[in-house]
């Protein structure tokens, strides 16, 4: 079925193919890397005729598959991903024609607010599915061009790079003797990107004015917030396929300035650390680079949060640095507290979840958390957390048994003597925490039994990443 849909799509978005030996826009070609689903390969096209590359049927087909794979909710028109193919069957000619002649008008994005840990909200802008398709097609052509320009120590939203690469690079720099850091904080970066400055930067590389104009239309498409249209005079709304690339293109200017000054740094999206060998040098760098960012890039630096300090205890991507002989990556205390708070939420006795739902949610969260924080040494911490988590799980099970008679029967099934089972089940002890901490409950709902029933163990999950 899926293969038949892909063949249909290829026919839907098929454009007349030009003979490359006779094509005018193929003259003066240049070779760039091209992203596929599995790798980056080199292809050849002309930067002055990028729109043709964007509208190439193979590129559009790949963009369609990416949009379908990523799913996501609909935009202001409420069109779902499943409705995209029927829409293309009916409207593909007018869509492609409007993109070619410059009459295409992107829809405003739908405002979505996501709560942040600090109590504030992250503003997302969800494009329509059709706009996501077009943005993804643009992204696939521009990414390999800009990948050649981007810095080696820029890790956010890039192929085959990620948070762990950024953390390892930061650890390496610190262990080379750069023990002081400027922890750069850009205030509401995605919401405050200067459109004119970004367009100027784009125009240096993209010589096809039609593509620059199309990107500018997306930047200025506006927002629907609670049913009210708002103009977008600045910012690259998070939520669309183009936003990560545009943010990297903007902050690549900062990367090049840092490299020009000979400074070592690591950047993941708008989260950057600049490394120095003394606190005095870090202070000078903080002041001068703040001036550059605000005056040249027209971005706002949060001066209260942008600090020059020793690297010990600085939070970066959820981790921090600690040293005995050399510097190791550790989980920041705030990240640990957030994890404990989430586990407490997942083991709440009042959420009404059954055993299977709770086990599934716990397992998903534990695997995700360990999969991200496994770079740190966590055996001692996770052993203590396992004790606490199992105690919380026992409370959930004890409450689920409800009636004293049921509790007594289940304790006996677990191998507890009938007298002890009766004593505990009908006791007037107050508090789930107290009663589930007794030796009887530990014997009945043992660690081995919990593991056998499928409840996750933090330490076991960690040891899967660190078998030694």
Language-model features: where?
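Right-hand nucleic-acid polymerase module
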Residues: 3, 346-407
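Non-catalytic, polymerase-adjacent accessory regions of viral genome-replication enzymes
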Residues: 1-89
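Conserved phosphate-binding loops in nucleotide/dinucleotide-binding enzymes
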Residues: 123-124, 128
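Amphipathic alpha-helical blocks
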Residues: 73, 83-108
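Conserved polymerase palm-domain catalytic core
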Residues: 98-113, 117, 152-313
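A conserved non-catalytic segment of reverse transcriptases
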Residues: 220, 296-367
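Nucleotide/phosphate-binding loop and acidic/charged catalytic motifs
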Residues: 138
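Extended C-terminal regions of large enzymes
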Residues: 392, 401-468
